[in-house]
């Protein structure tokens, strides 16, 4: 294997690539030494081939010298920005999964060193295959990356020299389950005999370099938080803390991957162009695995961060494991590489899962780990995910962003604490969650991976190809399946919790089409998974939970059943509630002293008539749109639908508050207790008295406000509640209609990869008289490695320009039939409820003879159920808050 060049301070390689080296003492214009060798290499650099993106190095604006002049001083950190203007970014931007041009394909081939015209004549080296079949090679990293490692780590007694000087590449030609030591595969932390306490995994599909850098840089800052702990007994014994942490990136296919993101990874040393092999002796490579320990990071604003001498805020070394799957095979397959391949070798105690684009907050990963450290029966946990609001919270001006921000906040204040109090959090979001590895081993992971289509042939009828459409939708929310299987694991008493101190920030959809498409997957998956957990609740009895825990799990199941029923009939409930309130206020009757409001006795009924039938007309439009159109193709229609239902909701809210105010001010409620408390309660809670409406309003909006204040997080009430309350109707009439009408839309296929075809193959040879196989590979000089690295850094630090994407959805006719049956059942059941309540012609089936009385009773049931569920959530939230406050005083730190 190649040997890296020495760390000579005067070596021409380091001098030419020294934009990682220490800055000059002059704060304005640094002075850099130049010698003849450097001048020759600069000349050679300019005479070399064009960069992979087609522009020449002759431009003085992009010379290597100019890179040194751009520094950004973050506290204790020096970073480097590209010297060219934003308009040049298009010249260095690689295409994403849609619409690769021939020029970009040619650039990708040049980056991988496929074209003979792009190759120089180098020396070669022989590389022996592990056990005669596994290709695992060490490649020297650029001198600039080597020199960025601080001497205190590089020269430490427990350090391994090659982990800082060489990147290790392994071509995995096997299934994740076969990635084992027995088959010749290994990972550096295991080779170095290091204990992995924390495995931090980032799953990626096609996110741009800004989103990826946001997550990766946030993770590295969190690793620094852990390493800098001074009083920790655990992290400060048995070796340096950074050696107990591994950061794993799993990219779901070469084809959808943003190539600029690969440049970011190459800039910090964990990836190199031209080393991947599409097959080894005809055996197709399934995953390309890179390993390197780095101290470099790239910020979301494309600033390069490196350590400074004697600065406590420096990033520590981070053990990076980068898995680039050759084909797109879905996120669940990425988790199979994480849990069944890498985790079996590293055997981590805790696995933290993040999605690319989720930025963990300060010390958030430490807070997640502490929850497991202080509770040995904790099997899984999640943190608080909140929406990214932009600078100055300007994103809350967008109603969709504001509504989602409020929804996230209320879920973290009411829903997650309630479920945590029971010990079973129904969903630990894959974007920001953690599991104890030994807790999910066995049946939980086995059931979880039934949704991996790459296992369909092996599993047969139990696999994804043998599932009906209901089960396939269930695996759209596969994280819910894993949560249930973990709690119900036979013989164990694992529970789940929510960690308030751990926070993660994520971007949310800002336009209606993206929002609808996202919620389709969430709603269908959660609905199917909720039914799964209810139908398989009996498996809880085989677990090792205590009697008290079992009792509360039963209470939670009853609560979940009530929520499911309320959700199923919510289409009718929203219509009936809106209609009843409009009739109570806008129709002259004895209940309102024959005074219709707000447009008078003549106009109010007419306005309400048009509002109600306009409501039904737009609702019918949603079924037409959902059954035959894509949200991106009918953006205007969906936007207008959102606006209409928001206006109706605003109108109904005004009528509701008027009804309550009029009940108190107009004498509709009898406050005379002389005739007994029963008479007062009867008057207060009658369907026409306004008291029950007051209870429903207070139990909903009032609880939101009180709980937010108790959690000392009330700002979303001021900034985002308006959008959420106005958009409550849209969540049912638009999102659920679209989700159920597209129940059949489940695609699990693997796409081919032209980018994988562009990779070179590895063919083995046998030496005379030797039984071992080897491959012969080009041995590039360090100077050429550094030269190519210059181009990589320029691409990585180029200003980001968002590309335009156009995606299509392929549907299967057999799934449409099930979809139609489900939608018909949903519509008919809600229509039946509406007819039973409002139709005067149906008398023999009901206890009362008038629709008015039935409407009053139904109105009371809906409002009381809403109030009861809200109060139940509030009680659970208060319990969690008190428990957290007590545990905060007694837990180990």
UniProtKB/Swiss-Prot annotation:
Record EC number: 2.4.1.16
Annotated GO MF terms: chitin synthase activity
Chain residue ranges for the region called Disordered: 1-43
Keyword entries, A-Z: Cell membrane, Cell wall biogenesis/degradation, Glycosyltransferase, Membrane, Transferase, Transmembrane, Transmembrane helix
Compositionally skewed regions (Polar residues) per UniProt: 10-20
Compartments (UniProt record): Cell membrane
The keyword Ion transport is annotated on this UniProt entry: no
Keyword Metal-binding (UniProt): no
Source species, domain of life: Eukaryota
GO terms (BP aspect): cell wall organization; chitin biosynthetic process
Compositional bias segments (type: Low complexity): 21-31
Membrane-traversing stretches: 565-585, 606-626, 640-660, 690-710, 721-741, 822-842, 861-881
UniProt catalytic activity: [(1->4)-N-acetyl-beta-D-glucosaminyl](n) + UDP-N-acetyl-alpha-D-glucosamine = [(1->4)-N-acetyl-beta-D-glucosaminyl](n+1) + UDP + H(+)
Cysteine disulfide partners in this protein: none
Similarity comment text for this entry: Belongs to the chitin synthase family. Class III subfamily.
PANTHER family named among the record's database cross-references: CHITIN SYNTHASE (PTHR22914:SF39)
Function: Polymerizes chitin, a structural polymer of the cell wall and septum, by transferring the sugar moiety of UDP-GlcNAc to the non-reducing end of the growing chitin polymer.
Protein name, entry field: Chitin synthase C
Species this chain originates from: Aspergillus fumigatus (strain ATCC MYA-4609 / CBS 101355 / FGSC A1100 / Af293) (Neosartorya fumigata)
Gene: chsC
């Amino acid at each position: 294997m190649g040997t890296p060049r020495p760390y000579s301070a005067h070596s021409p390689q380091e001098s030419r690539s020294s934009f990682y080296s220490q800055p000059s003492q002059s704060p304005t214009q640094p002075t850099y030494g130049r010698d003849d060798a450097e001048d020759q290499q600069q000349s050679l650099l300019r005479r070399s081939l064009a960069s992979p993106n087609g522009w020449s190095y002759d431009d003085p604006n992009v010379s290597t010298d100019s890179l040194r002049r751009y520094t950004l001083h973050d506290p204790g950190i020096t970073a480097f920005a590209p010297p060219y203007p934003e308009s040049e970014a298009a010249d260095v931007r690689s295409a994403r999964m849609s619409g690769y041009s021939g020029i970009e394909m040619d650039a990708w081939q040049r980056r991988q060193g496929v074209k003979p015209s792009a190759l120089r004549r180098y020396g070669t080296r022989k590389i022996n295959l592990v056990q005669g079949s596994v290709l695992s090679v060490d490649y020297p990293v650029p001198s600039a990356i080597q020199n960025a490692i601080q001497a205190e780590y590089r020269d430490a007694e427990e350090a391994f020299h090659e982990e800082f000087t060489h990147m290790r590449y392994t071509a995995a030609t096997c299934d994740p389950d076969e990635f084992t030591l027995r088959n010749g595969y290994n990972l550096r932390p295991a080779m170095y005999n290091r204990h992995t306490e924390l495995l931090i995994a980032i799953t990626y599909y096609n996110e741009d370099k800004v989103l990826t850098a946001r997550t990766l840089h946030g993770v590295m800052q969190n690793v620094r938080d852990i390493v800098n702990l001074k009083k920790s007994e655990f992290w400060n014994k048995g070796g340096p803390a950074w050696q107990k942490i591994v950061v794993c990136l799993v990219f779901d296919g070469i084809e959808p991957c943003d190539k600029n993101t690969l440049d970011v990874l190459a800039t910090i040393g964990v990836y190199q162009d031209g080393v991947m092999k599409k097959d080894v002796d005809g055996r197709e490579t399934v995953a390309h695995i890179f390993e390197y320990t780095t101290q470099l990071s790239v910020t979301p604003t494309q600033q390069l961060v490196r350590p400074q001498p004697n600065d406590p805020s420096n990033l520590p070394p981070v053990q990076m494991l980068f898995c680039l799957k050759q084909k797109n095979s879905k996120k669940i397959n990425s988790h199979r590489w994480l849990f069944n391949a890498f985790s079996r070798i590293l055997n981590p105690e805790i696995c933290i899962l993040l999605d690319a684009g989720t930025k963990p907050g300060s010390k958030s990963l430490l807070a997640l780990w502490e929850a497991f450290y202080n509770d040995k029966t904790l099997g899984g946990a999640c943190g608080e995910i909140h929406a990214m609001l932009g600078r100055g919270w300007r994103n809350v001006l967008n109603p969709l962003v504001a509504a989602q921000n409020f929804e996230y906040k209320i879920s973290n204040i009411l829903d997650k604490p309630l479920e945590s109090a029971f010990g079973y959090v129904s969903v630990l979001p894959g974007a920001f969650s953690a599991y104890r590895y030994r807790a999910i081993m066995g049946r939980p992971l086995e059931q979880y991976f039934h949704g991996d289509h790459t296992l369909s042939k092996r599993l047969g009828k139990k696999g994804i190809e043998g599932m009906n459409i209901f089960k396939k939708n269930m695996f759209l929310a596969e994280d819910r399946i894993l949560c249930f299987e973990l709690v119900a694991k036979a013989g164990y008493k694992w529970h789940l919790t929510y960690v308030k101190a751990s926070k993660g920030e994520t971007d949310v959809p800002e336009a209606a089409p993206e929002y609808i498409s996202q919620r389709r997957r969430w709603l269908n998956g959660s609905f199917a998974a909720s039914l799964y957990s209810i139908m398989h609740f009996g498996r809880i009895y085989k677990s090792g939970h205590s009697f008290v825990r079992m009792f509360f799990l039963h209470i939670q199941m009853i609560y979940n059943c009530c929520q499911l029923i309320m959700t199923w009939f919510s289409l009718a409930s929203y219509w009936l509630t809106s209609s009843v309130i409009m009739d109570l206020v806008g129709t002259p009757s004895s209940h309102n002293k024959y005074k219709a409001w707000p447009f008078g006795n003549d106009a109010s009924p007419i306005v309400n008539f048009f509002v109600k039938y306009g409501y039904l007309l737009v609702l019918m439009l949603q079924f037409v749109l959902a059954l035959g159109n894509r949200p991106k193709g009918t953006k205007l229609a969906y936007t207008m639908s959102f606006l209409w239902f928001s206006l109706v909701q605003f109108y109904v809210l005004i009528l509701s508050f008027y009804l309550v105010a009029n009940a108190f001010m107009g004498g509709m409620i009898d406050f005379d207790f002389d005739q007994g408390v029963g008479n007062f309660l009867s008057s207060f809670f009658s369907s026409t008295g306004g008291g029950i409406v007051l209870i429903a309003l207070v139990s909903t909006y009032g609880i939101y406000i009180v709980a937010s204040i108790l959690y000392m997080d009330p700002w979303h009430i001021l900034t985002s509640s308006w959008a959420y309350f106005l958009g409550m109707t849209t969540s049912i009439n638009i999102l659920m209609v679209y989700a159920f009408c597209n129940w059949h839309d489940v695609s699990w296929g693997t796409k081919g990869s032209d980018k994988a075809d562009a990779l070179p193959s590895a063919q083995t040879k046998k030496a005379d008289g030797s039984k071992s196989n080897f491959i012969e590979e080009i041995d590039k000089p360090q100077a050429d490695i550094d030269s190519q690295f210059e181009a990589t850094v320029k691409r990585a630090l180029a200003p980001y320009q968002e590309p335009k994407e156009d995606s299509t959805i392929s549907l299967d006719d057999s799934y449409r039939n099930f979809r139609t049956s489900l939608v018909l059942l949903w519509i008919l059941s809600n229509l039946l409820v509406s007819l039973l309540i409002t139709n005067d012609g149906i008398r023999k089936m009901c206890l009362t003879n008038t629709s008015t009385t039935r409407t009053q009773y139904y109105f009371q049931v809906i409002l009381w159920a809403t109030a009861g569920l809200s109060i139940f959530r509030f009680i659970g939230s208060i319990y969690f808050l008190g428990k957290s406050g007590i545990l905060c005083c007694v837990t180990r730190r």
